[in-house]
Amino acid sequence: MTFLELVRKRCSVRQYSDRTVEPEKMNYVLEAARLAPSAVNKQPWHMLLVESEEKRQLLQSCYNREWFKQAPLYLIVCGDHTESWKRADGKDHLDIDVAILTEHLCLAAAEQGLGTCWVCNFDAPRVKELFALPEHIEPIVLLPLGYPADESVFEGEKKRKTLTEIYAHH
């Protein structure tokens, strides 16, 4: 699969099967994330894998959507404010770095036939409390992960702006 084929395959999956994600596939996805670049190579991130039914229910209470409850696994992708690089004007690159890591997770998952969906509209203070995250660690993305209920979801055409709408040459 070429890179463009992979990028075309990756999509937001909101229906999951109950099929178990093999540990070797999960390790592959995590290794792809580990290799993600970051500003000044600070790597200001932490990931929590949520797998037990008890912890899954706790996390589901932070984003109460029926489709979200179907996923067999979740990653809580967090940023570490003490580790992130700040530009001279004060711009913190934490969200950018975590976004790069998260998309590495999503692309590696898609390559392995797994579905994901970025979730940022969740109760972050509740996640922080329920998972006992230290003050300097911010939960930024919830990433449900599992096999799609319908594998044809990977074949759909993406609705995207044309290149001329987003690109200029000077």
Model-derived features: positions:
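Glycine/small-residue-rich phosphate/adenosyl-binding loop
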Residues: 25, 30-31, 35-101
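Structural motif
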Residues: 72-76, 116-117, 140-141
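Short secondary-structure boundary segments
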Residues: 79, 121-122, 147
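GST superfamily/GST-like fold recognition
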Residues: 114-126
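C-terminal helix-cap and adjacent tail motif
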Residues: 3-13, 17-20, 25, 141-170
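Short, electropositive alpha-helical surface patch
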Residues: 127-140
